[in-house]
Amino acid sequence: MTVLIHVLGSDIPHHNHTVLRFFNDTLAATSEHAREFMVAGEDNGFTESCPALSLRFYGSKKALAQAVIAKAKANRRQRFFFHGQFNTSLWLALLSGGIKPAQFYWHIWGADLYEVSNGLKFRLFYPLRRIAQGRVGCVFATRGDLSYFARQHPNVRGELLYFPTRMDPSLNAMAKECQRAGKLTILVGNSGDRSNQHIAALRAVYQQFGDTVNVVVPMGYPANNQAYIDEVRQAGLALFSAENLQILSEKMEFDAYLALLRQCDLGYFIFARQQGIGTLCLLIQADIPCVLNRDNPFWQDMAEQHLPVLFTTDDLNEQVVREAQRQLASVDKSGITFFSPNYLQPWHNALRIAAGEAE
């Protein structure tokens, strides 16, 4: 029997760390198909912190792709589980036959599915990637992303799967201890990545609420982002008074980030695609409603779980926000499909499907 190989095809430290830690702590002990990884980027202590996994690191995305293609050609029974897919060479290999459809299983992370960049090289590459995506053996994704993908590729198998957000189920009831009143605090974006469209989001918040709310913008990740942080701060101070705007430029530890989220009354996410599920989950767990772009298909997942959804096009005010908080507080968090531990069983199913052990 050939053991499934997992591929992290791009050097995205935060996401890769979450995936590796999840597999090491939760999946590796019960499945031999949850232990082999090929990772783009440096070790950064992963080998030491994930002793249950067999990890191979590659200095570049291209080097990793070449190694994957060589393995795929050497043994056509070898299957790969691609987590996210930000690696041009791997898509081209699927397109050209270097990797066969029966070898290629893909967990969509959102950004790797949507065509949002206006850069020339991306606009030229997107049509090729779209064709390649139609050759995937099976995709795993959120309900909204599965729906989006199926419109383009109705013949490709799709299975529900959620990114393994680090969550403590015991905190599901913690929000009940918080009494929310006074000036609203609004979280804008889930990181410092430009995909959050921070400046447009700040303007949208100002248009809805004026300079009457506290605005918190977490921008400690990714690193080396000071120029963009300064740009966002300047735009924010043109709208909000200094005491109402908090730009967080330092990377935060998980517990500190969790404490920050629980001080908020509303999350505001203007991006028109699925991203930031981890932050959304932690906000929902704390009974903090989220404002989404109507083009972000994750609203379908939220509606399926009977969670209130606010949209950027809605008329928002404190009364609307407090009512959404009340509705969230009435939801039994233990039944939400994309919360821990409920997302675990779909992961076990995904491993069996990708390994060829389940229909």
From Swiss-Prot:
GO molecular function, a single term: 4-acetamido-4,6-dideoxy-D-galactose transferase activity
Entry-linked InterPro entries: WecF
Transmembrane segments: none
Chief location bin: membrane
Pathway: Bacterial outer membrane biogenesis; enterobacterial common antigen biosynthesis
Subcellular location per the Swiss-Prot or TrEMBL entry: Cell inner membrane
Reactions performed catalytically: beta-D-ManNAcA-(1->4)-alpha-D-GlcNAc-di-trans,octa-cis-undecaprenyl diphosphate + dTDP-4-acetamido-4,6-dideoxy-alpha-D-galactose = alpha-D-FucNAc4-(1->4)-beta-D-ManNAcA-(1->4)-D-GlcNAc-undecaprenyl diphosphate + dTDP + H(+)
GO biological process terms held by the UniProt record: enterobacterial common antigen biosynthetic process; fucosylation
Membrane topology per record: Peripheral membrane protein
Keywords: Cell inner membrane, Cell membrane, Glycosyltransferase, Membrane, Transferase
Any Gene Ontology CC annotation: plasma membrane
ATP-binding found in the keyword field: no
Pfam family for this entry, one: Glyco_transf_56
EC nos: 2.4.1.325
Family: Belongs to the glycosyltransferase 56 family.
Function: Catalyzes the synthesis of Und-PP-GlcNAc-ManNAcA-Fuc4NAc (Lipid III), the third lipid-linked intermediate involved in ECA synthesis.
Protein name: TDP-N-acetylfucosamine:lipid II N-acetylfucosaminyltransferase
Organism: Salmonella dublin (strain CT_02021853)
